[in-house]
Amino acid sequence: IRCEAPNDELADPMLAKARIGRILETEIPVGGPIHATPGRRRLVALVGPTGVGKTTTIAKLAANFRLRQRQNVGLITVDTYRIAAVEQLRTYADIIDLPMEVVSSPREMRSAARRLEGLDLILMDTAGRSPRDEIKIQELRSFLSEAEADEVHLVLSSVAGERALVHTAARFASVGTTGMILTKLDEATSLGNLLPLVRSSRLPISYLTNGQSVPDDIETAESGRLARLVL
């Protein structure tokens, strides 16, 4: 900043903050929303550790694409480990009137995807996985490979610590992550932990969530807003 900004700008806190914000905007990559094209099926999977809000985020995305964008949407869940996880997603599917497939093993994935073949967008919910559990990460990799996912978004809680975020993103990179979704912005006091995450992972941020309300509490990520949250 000292190299780029004149002294009078550095002396003014507001001008200095604005300069820092513009620099941060260039350092925080955003990926834009999911693009679902009518008649061309797109399969998007959400992955991540436990408790970050993957299922609720799936419901928000599904409701927005179905009710607001009038896309033909289907759901797949492979989260058969967590108690009531399937029922939670099925409740959303019933409310929004979406077809849903439950997949218990990777070998069932292709037939489930075929049954949803005529849709514009398929959203795939996965079980939360510890980044330290290599066996479960490998199993997740098998599910995604069989699904032939077009996009894999890593869902992370914005209230997690810097080291945990960086470590989690590094471990999930092996499943082919293409973007990130940050959840629980309503619980975060700042996003200072974001810069090390994006610098190490190099993943663009696609969406932000800031509450539990379906379908309202989700927004497309914008670099300017993220820069302001970091500051």
Region spans (language model):
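Generic detector of well-ordered alpha-helical packing
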Residues: V78-T80, T126, K184
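A short, aliphatic-rich alpha-helical micro-motif
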Residues: P38, L116-E117
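Conserved catalytic-core segment of NTP-binding enzymes
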Residues: G74, A85-Q88, I95, S104-R115, ...
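Glycine-rich beta-strand-to-loop/alpha-helix junction loops that act as flexible
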Residues: V47-G48, D125-A127
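Primarily NTPase-proximal linker/entry elements flanking Walker-type ATP/GTP-binding cores
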Residues: I1-V52, T56-V73, T77-T80, T91-S105, ...
